[in-house]
């Protein structure tokens, strides 16, 4: 920083510029997105249709939580006889990706018609577990249709892109 007292101005000398914060996160997101897109994991031909009649829903979400509350409230209002199985998962932090994958795997053996991945809104970092490769693979390879309900509408995760419905 140089100071010019006479004019009362400062001059900044920039020695280095680099992307920080969301830049690196966005770069990782775009890299994985491009890789999975090239593999065809977002292609419509792989999207499973939801059953016409849904009797049993599996939910992978933090429990208790607002996301689960909203799903239960809306589903039972439409069909008071619907069964909802909740797999309580970590949806944020280091343990979250494996916890989400275990939830998907567990619910596959519970005779559910559809699986909902749910997590309320948050920062990109808070939602990052749904951008991990292991979660994308579990969603893509699941024989049961998966609905992704992650974050706010304007937030898009890798899980949203791979899932059968968003």
Identify what each model region corresponds to.
Residues 54-166:
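Short glycine/threonine-rich loop/turn motifs
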Residues 1-87:
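Short, glycine/charged-enriched hinge/interface segments at domain edges or termini
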